[in-house]
């Protein structure tokens, strides 16, 4: 197969590993800088040009689209889809998962376990919003944040009110979530490929911190997940319409709660921690499922 990898940086661990795994399995791998691709949206013959030449003959495309280039990245990926190229994750599903609120709304509709979450616009509603998520301590998240940036733990109602007012004053869209104390600053990253959890790791926040993201100094370790956690992760990825996803789960007193479904999960943490060839499994999934003009939208909403 001839496989395109949409990535701004060919030197990133995840991009390198996907290219290596593809070459090892006998495929032609081409890394394309997402922002340097441009499109000809012509009737009957949609095209993508790159460095002055049209991109042709691709069987599949692996999107590694960073959060900051979601809009343009999804447009390029959608153009590949219009050309009949099979996407590992499709543009609609990526756009869906990048909107944290939309993701939670879709997951809640399907009855998937979530932390109680509030969303509001008007400052008059702050006291009721705080009560809605069972009061302080609570977590406030900026909707556009990634890698744990823009996430605040408020220990008291007073602190929560001040932080919410500050974010609202900056015209930031925010979510307010119950704090799951029993998770103890740890979450579980389940790596879903197709309809299986192929690898999972526990991420523990460093002392004095509650955000377990590896970018925030969290430490990864091996973990055995429960059947319920496995089913929750697979269902969450399916609701979002993602073939490959990093599903972040908290262990709570009332079962697994989904924090986030990531459409472009990093490979370094999971491969180094588990010793598994995750990149190889992703390429294998493409081989089994990829094919021309198989770009029907998965998921709803």
UniProtKB/Swiss-Prot annotation:
Free-text remark on how the cofactor is bound: Binds 2 magnesium or manganese ions per subunit.
Xref: InterPro entries: ATP-grasp, ATP-grasp_RimK-type, ATP_grasp_subdomain_1, RimK, Rimk_N, Rp_bS6_RimK/Lys_biosynth_LsyX
UniProt: Mg(2+) 2 binding residues: 260, 262
Chain residues that bind ATP: 141, 178-179, 187, 211-213
Entry binding sites for Mg(2+) 1: 248, 260
Keywords annotated in UniProt: ATP-binding, Ligase, Magnesium, Manganese, Metal-binding, Nucleotide-binding, Protein biosynthesis
BP term (GO), one: SOS response
Residue ranges of every copy of the ATP-grasp domain listed in the record: 104-287
Keyword Metal-binding carried by entry: yes
E.C. designation(s): 6.3.2.-
PROSITE patterns: ATP_GRASP
Binding positions for Mn(2+) 1 per the UniProt entry: 248, 260
GO MF term set: ATP binding; metal ion binding; ribosomal S6-glutamic acid ligase activity
Gene Ontology CC: one annotated term: cytoplasm
Positions with a binding annotation for Mn(2+) 2: 260, 262
UniProt cofactor(s): Mg(2+); Mn(2+)
Family, as annotated: Belongs to the RimK family.
Name recorded for this polypeptide: Probable alpha-L-glutamate ligase
Species this protein is from: Pseudomonas putida (strain GB-1)
Protein encoded by which gene: rimK
